[in-house]
Amino acid sequence: MAAQGFLLIATFLLVLMVLARPLGSGLARLINDIPLPGTTGVERVLFRALGVSDREMNWKQYLCAILGLNMLGLAVLFFMLLGQHYLPLNPQQLPGLSWDLALNTAVSFVTNTNWQSYSGETTLSYFSQMAGLTVQNFLSAASGIAVIFALIRAFTRQSMSTLGNAWVDLLRITLWVLVPVALLIALFFIQQGALQNFLPYQAVNTVEGAQQLLPMGPVASQEAIKMLGTNGGGFFNANSSHPFENPTALTNFVQMLAIFLIPTALCFAFGEVMGDRRQGRMLLWAMSVIFVICVGVVMWAEVQGNPHLLALGTDSSINMEGKESRFGVLVSSLFAVVTTAASCGAVIAMHDSFTALGGMVPMWLMQIGEVVFGGVGSGLYGMMLFVLLAVFIAGLMIGRTPEYLGKKIDVREMKLTALAILVTPTLVLMGAALAMMTDAGRSAMLNPGPHGFSEVLYAVSSAANNNGSAFAGLSANSPFWNCLLAFCMFVGRFGVIIPVMAIAGSLVSKKSQAASSGTLPTHGPLFVGLLIGTVLLVGALTFIPALALGPVAEYLS
């Protein structure tokens, strides 16, 4: 079993790196504001037709463009969900959503979280799924990538005030990265057996003679960008464990690759743009070390079996509860870590049914800020915050003004870095405390004791860090939970983007300093260890008390 797990992890990472490297080169061209070959004429026509100016923006203008697009998308999606019964492509005549569920869902998909307090096949029409959710899957992913584009440019430019043009970046990211790759993935899913139709639900007779209603819909097209954009919201309630979404072991492997593809490619692009590929490899090493350790821990915990069943004298050699037998425990464990290391949230197994230790690792990966590969764009700019913090700590230890890639890291940058890092832990801890203090919060818990608290902590961690997965034992479709989680998702997304853009605006105005004998190298194993230690230290200090009340207490009981 250990050899199989090692081979699975090694194969996954090897294929991932091979695919991400050329994509990273394409992203590097876009960051450097160089159109991809053959796209210049199309871009010129589109920009003219849409009235888009290619004039560069400062950080405030860039931020306002990103926020404006997302707020407009939020309003449109909210009213679309409220009135979906008036809109076309609704063969099941599904009614509009309640205001609180519509708000929660709109915020969820605009912020790239894709938390779902509903069952897709019984709640949303085809039009809502396509024109509402799928569109936001593209736009939210493009927004995250655009933000990291701006931050990377802040390190490459000197004594400037501009970071690029948000509209140009968003169009290029969507047209030349997200749409083509998602189209290829969708066609592959269709070839493998994923649904893509507009038929009404089909009544069929089962082998036992009973009747069953099979849901239909344009699944493959949404499934592709759901994974590629690290969105995670499933067309069906069972998400990627549903055979209509994820029909074969091969599609399952491609889905995991799609989740990590752009975050990995962005690391390669970062090194290429900086003119020092070692900088990108340093980030990949730090992310990969944490990732491999976490996968190993979850695999080990799930292979040990369910201790509660063992205590009852029942055979439980491996913990298969809540897992698809066609994927097995090792693949389910790998998928769980992939989807929570990235801000995806798609699942092929029920995380609520994992062992205490096996469920704690995905929760902790979210709590440290989704920086282990992370979401498209958001993962890299989240890790860059920890890089700045690590550089600052190193500067304190050696008594020098910290600098990174030639840019001095001053008080302003560190205040903004601390603010961005503290946003999500504050939301998680205060949100969980509020839920446990109120009847409306506690009434959603279906399990008592430490596991019930783990369900609450997981939900708030997932929302605040824009992941979207859940311990499904929590009944979260109520006004209290819909509003609480919507607030956490909104602030957790934009409360980090705003200080990140402010950091970019501050750095782009500075001159680059030549490296000296006292400059800390940020590309070697020493800095990789320092960066990993910084991530672990912040995560440990912040969340160990809360984790001790939930999964740790459950593990020890």
UniProtKB/Swiss-Prot annotation:
Part of the high-affinity ATP-driven potassium transport (or Kdp) system, which catalyzes the hydrolysis of ATP coupled with the electrogenic transport of potassium into the cytoplasm. This subunit binds the periplasmic potassium ions and delivers the ions to the membrane domain of KdpB through an intramembrane tunnel. This is Potassium-transporting ATPase potassium-binding subunit. Has two separate and distinct potassium-binding sites. One site is formed by three periplasmic loops and is inferred to be the site of initial binding. The other site is cytoplasmic. Its main location: membrane. It is a multi-pass membrane protein. Pfam families: KdpA (PF03814). A protein-embedded tunnel connects the potassium ion in KdpA to a water molecule at the canonical cation site in the transmembrane domain of KdpB. The structures suggest a translocation pathway for potassium via two inter-subunit half-channels along KdpA and KdpB, integrating KdpB directly in the transport process. The periplasmic potassium ion probably enters the selectivity filter of KdpA, travels through the water-filled tunnel to reach KdpB, and is released to the cytoplasm by KdpB. KdpB undergoes conformational changes, whereas KdpA, KdpC and KdpF remain static. NCBIfam families: kdpA. The chain crosses the membrane at residues 3-27, 62-84, 126-149, 166-192, 250-269, 280-300, 357-368, 415-435, 480-501, 525-552. Induction: Transcriptionally regulated by the KdpD/KdpE two-component regulatory system. GO terms for cellular component: plasma membrane; potassium ion-transporting ATPase complex; potassium:proton antiporter complex. Belongs to the KdpA family. Coiled coil: none annotated. Keywords: Cell inner membrane, Cell membrane, Ion transport, Membrane, Potassium, Potassium transport, Transmembrane, Transmembrane helix, Transport. GO terms for molecular function: P-type potassium transmembrane transporter activity; potassium ion binding. GO terms for biological process: monoatomic cation transmembrane transport; potassium ion transmembrane transport; potassium ion transport. Residues 1-2, 85-125, 193-249, 301-356, 436-479, 553-557 are periplasmic. It is found in: Cell inner membrane. The system is composed of three essential subunits: KdpA, KdpB and KdpC. The complex also contains KdpF, a small non-essential subunit. The KdpFABC complex exists as a dimer above concentrations of 30-50 nM, whereas the complex exists as a functional monomer at lower concentrations. The keyword Transmembrane helix applies. Residues 28-61, 150-165, 270-279, 369-414, 502-524 are cytoplasmic.
